[in-house]
Amino acid sequence: MKKLEALLENSFNIRFDDKRLLETAFTHTSYANEHRLLNISHNERLEFLGDAVLQLIISEYLFAKYPKQTEGDMSKLRSTIVREESLAGFSRYCSFDAYIKLGRGEEKSGGRHRDTILGDLFEAFLGALLLDKGIEEVRRFLNQVMIPQVEQGTFEKVKDYKTCLQELLQAKGDVVIDYQVISETGPAHAKQFEVAVLVGEDHLSKGTGRSKKLAEQDAAKNALAQLSEV
């Protein structure tokens, strides 16, 4: 953890008082489960807290930044900013992926590079930072890491895959597109949804995500990739 502490201090001017909070934020459930006798805490509860403070800070920012945007437009942009893929990218940008503790099986299966794990890690770090330093320190960190990307319009350029799929298919004729939840797993604060996209009665593709909306976007993205190969 010394290297992680040095990274945070040198890159972001962050120094944790409670080192246990920081260690917990970087401990995946798979690692804790493999070391049950040591009674190690994992980062799911911190992830829950981090998700909440992230939503609040980004919502406040968008409300102030875009006074003429509708609630729907702001919600869509916020969803893009805080989606799993985006948060995983921020974890990589901060080099957090190098420091997460994973179980052996998760490590071997490529968990260190998985968006789901890295997105959760970013939220867990925010939760730990909130408890250790307060919301203003979380806001300062996000102003360093996330907000510059928002200011550059990065997230406004992200594709709405459902709309792209609908436009592509309807250009070929009048079709009915439907999204159905196949499975719902995980605890209440860390759900994982699997969704299928159907065209009429034909199963086109599947996708996963931490919400139904994200899973639908992933399914539409996979469907577009599949159709491009035809």
Swiss-Prot record:
Mind telling me which NCBIfam families this protein's record contains?
A: RNaseIII
Question: What is catalysed by this protein?
Answer: Endonucleolytic cleavage to 5'-phosphomonoester
Q: Where in the cell is it found?
A: Cytoplasm
Q: Which BP terms in the Gene Ontology apply to this protein? A: mRNA processing; regulation of gene expression; rRNA processing; tRNA processing
Subunit details = Homodimer.
Q: Which Pfam families match?
A: dsrm (PF00035), Ribonucleas_3_3 (PF14622)
Instruction: Cite a GO CC annotation.
Output: cytoplasm
What functional role does this protein have? Digests double-stranded RNA. Involved in the processing of primary rRNA transcript to yield the immediate precursors to the large and small rRNAs (23S and 16S). Processes some mRNAs, and tRNAs when they are encoded in the rRNA operon. Processes pre-crRNA and tracrRNA of type II CRISPR loci if present in the organism.
Keywords associated with the record: Cytoplasm, Endonuclease, Hydrolase, Magnesium, Metal-binding, mRNA processing, Nuclease, RNA-binding, rRNA processing, rRNA-binding, tRNA processing
Q: Is the keyword Disulfide bond in the record?
A: no
Q: Which family does it belong to?
A: Belongs to the ribonuclease III family.
Q: Which SUPFAM superfamilies match?
A: dsRNA-binding domain-like, RNase III domain-like
According to its UniProt record, this protein's enzyme class is hydrolase
Question: DRBM domain: from which residue to which, for each copy?
Answer: 160-229
Q: Where in the chain are disulfide-linked cysteines found?
A: none
Q: What is the lineage of its organism?
A: Bacteria, Bacillati, Bacillota, Bacilli, Lactobacillales
Q: Does the keyword rRNA-binding apply?
A: yes
Active site, UniProt feature: 51, 123
**CDD domains attached to this UniProt entry:** DSRM_RNAse_III_family, RIBOc
Indicate which residues the UniProt annotation says bind Mg(2+).
47, 120, 123
Q: Which InterPro entries match?
A: dsRBD_dom (IPR014720), RNase_III (IPR011907), RNase_III_dom (IPR000999), RNase_III_sf (IPR036389)
State what protein this is by name.
Ribonuclease 3
